[in-house]
């Protein structure tokens, strides 16, 4: 019971870095000596000290003979920071409780081996599911080579996204649209389509988040400014031009194309060519490519065509649906364009994770049955 109690505190600490640690995972560490917390820390940002180092420095000499509760296996290799295993030994930690092993197959288990080799008792698996949950994207990218993929949608209660003439501003309330900004800021990349850019001309940036109390706490803990997600526009027909709003906004933007054009693009715009025999953008190739850029979490914001294409590939891990108390009717545009299924067993299936009322609207979060 003590291990669970202290690991919960370590996981709570880890969450403080949720807006700033990517591509690294969120990690927290609590150091306990004689049932007293003598040190604590969390990983704040890539390139900065790991959680264990902050906790050890705050504990000082009191770390000798203590137990360290860490939400992820401590590193044993030299990277941007020295290995945490060495520091744990140097400070005299006698026992380490680890929520879960590092999912990176190249290093998984190495930290545990190092600790045991140097005489430290190790316990593994305390609140493992909870630790994985706060790092879903990192774990998925490391184990499958594909980031965690979220699809954001907004609809009426009859599942319609726009009137037949295309008008959709605004189906949901200001509060719901404000909440979308918080969904964006927790994403490493936003995928959209040229169709969406041509029709709505959106910015696809994070904005208007400063009024959120929880966000302010996270920013205070991180001591840094939020970075914008990488914007990824699928533009197989080269229809996006330097005049579109999203292009004029600062922050890295990928134009995913079959071939490049001769436009003069700003330095933050990168044309990425994904060509194949079908002359279409392969969405699996796209998300695998984004994983190589160390992107853990992808948010899709697009119309029914692209949303349906991703859904058919069965790679959507999470649905985020904002539902407005409006009825648009059967002539309005649907959420998806899907085939005419003959059997219910063939349809895409998700499970409800959370339902929240935001202003006049509902926010539904659903995950696949096989998603963590």
From Swiss-Prot:
Zn(2+) binds at residues 50, 75, 84. Pathway: Cofactor biosynthesis; riboflavin biosynthesis; 5-amino-6-(D-ribitylamino)uracil from GTP: step 2/4; Cofactor biosynthesis; riboflavin biosynthesis; 5-amino-6-(D-ribitylamino)uracil from GTP: step 3/4. Pfam families: dCMP_cyt_deam_1, RibD_C. Residues 1-122 form the CMP/dCMP-type deaminase domain. CDD domains: Riboflavin_deaminase-reductase. GO terms for biological process: riboflavin biosynthetic process. NADP(+) binds at residues 154, 170, 196, 200, 236, 303-309. It catalyses: 2,5-diamino-6-hydroxy-4-(5-phosphoribosylamino)-pyrimidine + H2O + H(+) = 5-amino-6-(5-phospho-D-ribosylamino)uracil + NH4(+); 5-amino-6-(5-phospho-D-ribitylamino)uracil + NADP(+) = 5-amino-6-(5-phospho-D-ribosylamino)uracil + NADPH + H(+). Residues 1-145 are annotated as: Deaminase. The keyword Manganese does not apply. Residues 146-372 are annotated as: Reductase. It comes from the Bacteria. The keyword Ligase does not apply. InterPro entries: APOBEC/CMP_deaminase_Zn-bd, CMP_dCMP_dom, Cytidine_deaminase-like, DHFR-like_dom_sf, Eubact_RibD, RibD_C, RibDG_C, Riboflavin_Biosynth_HTPR. Its cofactor is Zn(2+). Keywords: Hydrolase, Metal-binding, Multifunctional enzyme, NADP, Oxidoreductase, Riboflavin biosynthesis, Zinc. Its EC number is 3.5.4.26, 1.1.1.193. PROSITE patterns: CYT_DCMP_DEAMINASES_1, CYT_DCMP_DEAMINASES_2. One of its GO terms (molecular function) is NADP binding. Converts 2,5-diamino-6-(ribosylamino)-4(3h)-pyrimidinone 5'-phosphate into 5-amino-6-(ribosylamino)-2,4(1h,3h)-pyrimidinedione 5'-phosphate. In the N-terminal section; belongs to the cytidine and deoxycytidylate deaminase family. This is Riboflavin biosynthesis protein RibD. It comes from Buchnera aphidicola subsp. Baizongia pistaciae (strain Bp).
């Amino acid at each position: 019971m003590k291990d669970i109690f202290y690991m919960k505190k370590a996981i709570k600490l880890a969450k403080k870095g949720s807006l700033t640690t990517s591509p690294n995972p969120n990690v927290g560490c609590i150091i306990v000596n004689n049932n007293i917390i003598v040190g604590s820390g969390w990983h704040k940002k890539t390139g900065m000290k790991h959680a264990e180092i902050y906790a050890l420095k705050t504990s000082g000499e009191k770390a000798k003979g203590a137990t360290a509760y860490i939400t992820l296996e401590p590193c044993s290799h030299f990277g941007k920071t020295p290995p945490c295993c060495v520091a744990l030994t140097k400070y005299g930690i006698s026992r380490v409780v680890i929520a879960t092993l590092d999912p990176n197959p190249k290093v998984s288990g190495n930290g545990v081996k190092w600790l045991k080799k140097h005489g430290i008792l190790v316990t593994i698996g305390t609140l493992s599911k909870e630790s994985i949950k706060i790092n879903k994207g990192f774990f998925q990218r490391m184990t499958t080579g594909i980031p965690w993929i979220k699809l954001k949608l907004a609809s009426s209660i009859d599942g319609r996204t726009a009137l037949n003439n295309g008008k959709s501003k605004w189906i949901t309330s200001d509060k719901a649209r404000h909440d979308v900004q918080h969904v964006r800021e927790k994403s490493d990349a936003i995928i959209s389509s040229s169709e969406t850019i041509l029709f709505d001309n959106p910015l696809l940036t994070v904005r208007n988040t400063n009024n959120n109390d929880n966000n302010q706490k996270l920013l205070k803990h991180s001591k840094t400014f939020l970075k914008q997600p990488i914007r990824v526009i699928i533009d197989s027909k080269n229809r996006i031009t330097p005049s579109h709003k999203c292009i004029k906004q600062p922050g890295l933007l990928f134009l995913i194309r079959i071939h490049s054009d001769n436009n003069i693009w700003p330095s933050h715009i990168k044309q990425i060519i994904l060509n194949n025999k079908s002359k279409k953008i392969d969405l699996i190739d796209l998300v695998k490519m984004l994983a190589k850029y160390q992107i853990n979490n992808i948010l899709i914001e697009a119309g029914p065509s692209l949303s349906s294409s991703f859904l058919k590939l069965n790679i959507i891990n999470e649905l985020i649906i904002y539902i407005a108390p409006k009825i648009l009717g059967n002539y309005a545009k649907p959420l998806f364009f899907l085939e005419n299924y003959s059997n219910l067993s063939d349809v895409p299936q998700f499970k409800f994770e959370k339902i929240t009322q935001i202003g006049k609207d509902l926010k539904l979060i659903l995950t696949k049955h096989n998603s963590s």
